[in-house]
Amino acid sequence: MALLKNSGETAVEWVEINTPNELNSQLAQTIIDGYTKYLTIKDPMLAMGAFNEFKILCALKIGPYGANSVNHQAEQILQRKNLIGDNPAGGHSWYRGRPVMITRNDYSLGLYNGDIGITLPDPDAADNKLHVYFQDASGDVRRFLPHRLPEHETVYAMTVHKSQGSEFDRVVLILPDKDYPLMTRELIYTGLTRARQKVSVWGTEPVLTTAISRKIERSSGLREALWE
């Protein structure tokens, strides 16, 4: 905790967040600062690179501090700033800049659980038809019409669990306002080490200190539902 609170110019920052309202207030400028850059880029490869510079990671998937809620908040914030189009379906309609993560493998398309794509107009077409662009392991960019994608979700924020194996320049790690069995030192470590340059941890001191003192426990169905 001393490192987080007194990090100065180091790569770790602590932000005390005690209520959902405080979280939403803190998110407002963070979302604008983190995602404006990629939303102004037309080239798919450059947009994907800019998008991956910043990520919001949540310990939970559900609840006011979870990835689902933060994704909804992010869309509302970006809409109010006219950075994305109107999306009344809350993540289930398509607009320029929508980031999506595949949640079910489709071997015929070569798209797999955890793959992230960006929705953009075809830069070489006059009709501005939207495609979702993915970068594969070789660095090549592939595109798909939105209706062809397997199961997916909007991904301005993602769970720590889903972020494993990924790295970003800057990370915000959001902890819940109360303790859960899945809050372990391994989860905190995973969240912190997703950042190449800077990580900002948002939460309460009791939740963080309890998590750091707990080693990973055996999984359960409820744990997986909250975690993923």
List each model region and its residues.
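Structural motif
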Residues: 59-61, 104-105, 176-178, 204
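Conserved helicase motor core of P-loop NTPases
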Residues: 1-100, 106-109, 120
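C-terminal accessory regions
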Residues: 115-228
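Short hydrophobic-aromatic micro-motifs
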Residues: 56, 101-102, 173, 201
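N-terminal start-of-chain detector that recognizes signal peptides
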Residues: 27-30, 71-72, 89-92, 103, ...
